[in-house]
Amino acid sequence: MNFSGSPVQLPLLQVHLPGEVPYRTAWAWQQARLAHMIRDPQLPDGLLLLTHPAVYTLGAGADPKFLKSLSQPIGSPAIHPESPSEQEPEILRVERGGEVTYHGPGQWVGYAMLNLKRHRPDLHEYLRQLEEVVIQTLAHFGLQGERIPGLTGVWVQGRKVAAIGIKVSRWVTYHGFALNVCPDLAAFEAIVPCGIPDRPVGSLVHFCPEVTMAAVAPVLVESFCQVFGLQAQAVSLAEWLGEPRLSDKLLGESTAQTPKRK
């Protein structure tokens, strides 16, 4: 499937949309693809677009004070707890930059894995490009996305609708962006989102009540391709991981349906 519909033969972007995936699982998928991309510089760029069950994550240098009243222990995505709580979302410290944020249903999370040696090896420019992906997506729905000097992310009418946090290894990127479409914004009240106390969080549905997750997904992919000069190709999980001989069932893929444009 060609998301962009472009007749020009652009470099490929391998896209996988598995639905809802636990954070630890998606983290492991990124680690697997990262190893392949470092080992094989010819492997195409990749985008994993999914949703998570409720979870809070902190960047590598994030300050726990922004957790406010949350008292759960801070874990690692690489270590599975012996007795996970079914009542409270986990709190995980990960490699990305940035402070604490929330992921949950109603939010598209995009894990962008690009070899920046094929683009522009400039991390500040890369952050601005991820913001531009969101800004172009918002424009499709008639919304004006805004940047705030000195901060990373995208705002609409003063409300932050997209958070961005990245990690780069040998110029291969991972982690990425989170776009609030229709999440439960009450979940953000337990934290100081991104460590910014005076900037409220918002969502697309607040400004466009009829917008759906299914409608936003293909626009995000198309905007990503426009910004980075790529052509999207939908692939299986095994292909996305660089392990085409393995079945998705063995890799533990979510059984959720891939969203389609309405």
UniProtKB/Swiss-Prot annotation:
Its EC number is 2.3.1.181. It is found in: Cytoplasm. CDD domains: LipB. InterPro entries: aa-tRNA-synth_II/BPL/LPL, BPL_LPL_catalytic, Octanoyltransferase, Octanoyltransferase_CS. NCBIfam families: lipB, PRK14345.1. Residues 41-232 form the BPL/LPL catalytic domain. The active site is at 194 (acyl-thioester intermediate). Catalyzes the transfer of endogenously produced octanoic acid from octanoyl-acyl-carrier-protein onto the lipoyl domains of lipoate-dependent enzymes. Lipoyl-ACP can also act as a substrate although octanoyl-ACP is likely to be the physiological substrate. One of its GO terms (cellular component) is cytoplasm. In the reaction, the free carboxyl group of octanoic acid is attached via an amide linkage to the epsilon-amino group of a specific lysine residue of lipoyl domains of lipoate-dependent enzymes. Substrate binds at residues 96-103, 163-165, 176-178. PANTHER family: LIPOYLTRANSFERASE 2, MITOCHONDRIAL-RELATED, OCTANOYLTRANSFERASE. Keywords: Acyltransferase, Cytoplasm, Transferase. GO terms for molecular function: lipoyl(octanoyl) transferase activity. The gene is lipB. GO terms for biological process: protein modification process. This is Octanoyltransferase. Belongs to the LipB family. It catalyses: octanoyl-[ACP] + L-lysyl-[protein] = N(6)-octanoyl-L-lysyl-[protein] + holo-[ACP] + H(+). SUPFAM superfamilies: Class II aaRS and biotin synthetases (SSF55681). The keyword Cytoplasm applies. Pathway: Protein modification; protein lipoylation via endogenous pathway; protein N(6)-(lipoyl)lysine from octanoyl-[acyl-carrier-protein]: step 1/2. The record marks 160 as: Lowers pKa of active site Cys. Pfam families: LplA-B_cat.
